[in-house]
Amino acid sequence: MPDASLFNGTSFITLFAPNISLLQASIDFYTNFLGFAIRKNSNQKLFWLQLEEDQNNVSIQLILDPEHAASVSQIDQNIRNLTRSLYRKDWRSIQSNIAFKSSSLSKLVKLLKDGGHPVQQSPNEISPFEVYTVDPLGSLIGFSGFKNPFAVNERSLLPKVSEEKAYRAEDDSEKLLNPVRKTIGVMTSGGDSPGMNPFVRAVVRAGIYKGCKVFCIHEGYEGLVRGGEKYIKETQWHDVRGWLVEGGTNIGTARCKEFRERSGRLKACKNMIDMGIDALIVCGGDGSLTGADRFRSEWPSLIEELLQTEQISQQQFNTHQNLNICGAVGSIDNDMSSTDATIGAFSSLDRICRAIDYIDATANSHSRAFIVEVMGRHCGWLGLLAGLATSADYILIPEKPASSREWQDQMCDIVGKHRARGKRKTIVIVAEGAISNDLSPISCDQVKDVLVNRLGLDTRVTTLGHVQRGGTAVAFDRIYATLQGVEAVNAVLECDADTPSPMIAIKEDQITRVPLVDAVELTQQVAKSIESRNFKKAISLRDSEFVEHMKNFISTNSADHVPPSLPLEKRKKIAIINVGAPAGGMNSAVYSMATYCMSRGHVPYAIHNGFSGLARHESVRSINWLDIEGWGSLGGSEIGTNRTLPNDADIGMIAYFFEKYGFDGLILVGGFEAFISLHQLERARINYPSLRIPLVLIPATISNNVPGTEYSLGSDTCLNSFMEYCDVIKQSAAATRNRVFVVEVQGGNSGYIATHAQLACGAQISYVPEEGISLAQLEMDINSLKESFANDQGKTKSGRLILKSENASKVLTTEVISTIIDDEASGRFDSKTAIPGHVQQGGIPSPMDRVRASRFAIRAVSFIERHSDRCQTFKNSISFRQTDEITSTAVVLGIHKSQLRFTPIRQLYDFESDVPRRMRKNIFWSNVREISDMLSGRTSL
């Protein structure tokens, strides 16, 4: 029970409860935690509460009144929203609060936290002036230590301590203010990978934001064993500035034999205790994570031994009884089970695809064959996806071995047929772990000898080596490494001694936690299965997407060169059209659709220059294999695209040409214009029988605003292109010192690109159409810039970025915002604008866009195959009606939590679309905005 003098100020408030249980919970909250006493009880429906021995007559009236009270569901939702935004938003900006004055905030914080109530402290947890919590009715209760409610320079409420004591890890005042405050250590181990620096940056800033101390352990386990301030360094917020753009790991990594022995782990334990570290976050491969989990399991015996040998005190022993461990996978091979992607894998894939794109030019010039060796000792993910993204002629990976004679015959057969059809170049990708089915390794020189001796090709070998590891991370790795770093901090703060060590994973495009031991065991089973020649089990342990990519590569690689897999009566005529603005991956979709159709026996058609090209010029061409060779690596749209809709182009003429060519299915590739086009075609079916065919939309737009999907082709290419642009701009701002750039972002009414670019580029502020720009927010942001630049005196990397979506505000344009900032800066810093414009569409598509375009296109063709016969039954029906069965044949193919699904256009158009704003109704990236603001130190109103 707190003292009666704990707080005062507000004289009288009335609160309504919807039921008896919440009424009683509220009474318990105010009496047990805040020191109120029941002064009056009227029929168990009205209670008067008053502070005990209070001179200011502070009273609360609690009334059971379902009519005036918020509903139970509303109260629960409000409490969930506040709890979820505890570390992300200032509660004062979310709802109004009931305010009290208190002379003992530290005591109040301890009482509330001991009772399990969420507590938000402002401006920080070290020296709070205001404290906020939530009562059982969802009311926001505030407590201020200010005598003057408008004061900003009140003395610190921390107990006075000596300077020496203030720097001790076991400082009593810190314990009083935050009894569960942790000290987190973060390290990188094993092979380096792009994205490790963004991960460490996220851990440091998220940890500091949540009131923790964070130590970076340099040189991996080697630094942990050696210890001392040289290897284990406390890291501040500004220390990790600029790390997003840097490749590798700035805190170093090294393999450590000593840590494999118990004596080495004992030293590591002692060093961690000396620094006060009670939680460890490790980013590395399966070996590094296995070592971390073993370290945790031995921790009780290690500290017991340290106590027995008097290397630590009894107090240290009591304080560090448990060690929380959390792992994240940093590996370019993408060889960890239980996660869809490891940190650095897509960056490495990007390096490989760029290198092969460059090699293509010289190979084509000299009509040569190139053997390209890529990394992947036990995992062929890099080789497989690189082969799919670059349309390689043949790949050799560990998961699909064959006898020496078999792979040689198969490779020569495919390459020979490609050459006979007129292809001038040959690319064969060999994973470093490629083997034949007798487990003998397959070297690049062996492959070269086969091509030279059997086909007489001028052949060269290129080993990419460590080029695959180097360089800055791509947007995907920056974003997801950052999200994993934040989640790792949450994990070590939430786990207890009984919780199995978690590993942060990406499953279904969501950041999740999986048991670390289970993930490592599954990963090691793959290598064991390959060693025991159980190749079916090895590939079954890979995720389903890996198997699908394998099948897709085999199908597209054999296009038009082997007998079709479908009988004659099952073969169709399938058309593809691009609609809307160009987007990375459009050509890849056309290439994959056409080659897959050829392998199945279908006839692929391309409609050139959109619906206007079809209606005005009958721009329909059947697709020839050699004509589209190399399209997978090209940006833009080779068949042409525009924004003309079917109704505007003459839908009657479009239907006529569909009838003339006898199309059995149509694939649309494009953005919101393609979405509207699909809707118009589906509605016109009642008048035009030729449109009663399966219709599939593959979303492709940099805005990622198409309803029915969380990913559109071109958005990843756009993010990478815009990120590279911002990296250069930020470098200029940092070199100039005291400069902020306001960069305009495309995306229409969608803030997807601006939000994710803020996370990938480290921009301090982003403005998006979903939120708009209020004058209050702009004023707060400018004040934040002033403080940032004032604190930057003498520091490097002092440039700042502000991202502004083009439609965030029609009044506060990019130029206007820059001018306002310049004026408010009063010469302390300056502001410039940068408008990249259509540069954001990107040039060569990213590997992710290429691979997903292939997957989308093949799924779309398969959908047409499944539904074509059904459509034939009602195609010429006089009594045609739009039943659910019929409407389900006009669909949007999209990704929802990494699962591909087909959603009827009618459902999406009627219920999930904001057509006037050209947007989807559900905004799925709002949590990313909160994390972006948290890591940039921005307060969002």
From Swiss-Prot:
A single cellular component GO annotation: mitochondrion
Binding site for beta-D-fructose 2,6-bisphosphate 2: 643, 701-705, 746-748, 806, 838-841, 918
Reaction(s) the record says it catalyses: beta-D-fructose 6-phosphate + ATP = beta-D-fructose 1,6-bisphosphate + ADP + H(+)
Pfam family, one: PFK
Positions of ATP 1 binding: 191, 255-256, 285-288
Active site per the UniProt annotation: 333 (proton acceptor)
Any single GO BP term: fructose 6-phosphate metabolic process
Cofactor(s) in the UniProt record: Mg(2+)
Name of the gene encoding the protein in the UniProt record: PFK2
Binding site for Mg(2+): 286
Pathway entry: Carbohydrate degradation; glycolysis; D-glyceraldehyde 3-phosphate and glycerone phosphate from D-glucose: step 3/4
Enzyme class: transferase
This protein's name: ATP-dependent 6-phosphofructokinase subunit beta
Family statement drawn from the similarity comment of this UniProt entry: Belongs to the phosphofructokinase type A (PFKA) family. ATP-dependent PFK group I subfamily. Eukaryotic two domain clade 'E' sub-subfamily.
HAMAP family, sorted: Phosphofructokinase_I_E
C-terminal regulatory PFK domain 2 as annotated region, ranges: 573-941
Species of the source: Komagataella pastoris
EC number of this enzyme: 2.7.1.11
Subunit comment: Heterododecamer of 4 alpha, 4 beta and 4 gamma chains.
Residue positions binding beta-D-fructose 2,6-bisphosphate 1: 739, 832
Annotated residues for binding of ATP 2: 395, 400-405, 410, 557-558
PANTHER family with a match to the protein in the record: ATP-DEPENDENT 6-PHOSPHOFRUCTOKINASE (PTHR13697:SF4), PHOSPHOFRUCTOKINASE (PTHR13697)
Activity regulation, per record: Allosterically activated by ADP, AMP, or fructose 2,6-bisphosphate, and allosterically inhibited by ATP or citrate.
Binding positions (beta-D-fructose 6-phosphate 2): 331-333, 375-377, 432, 466-469
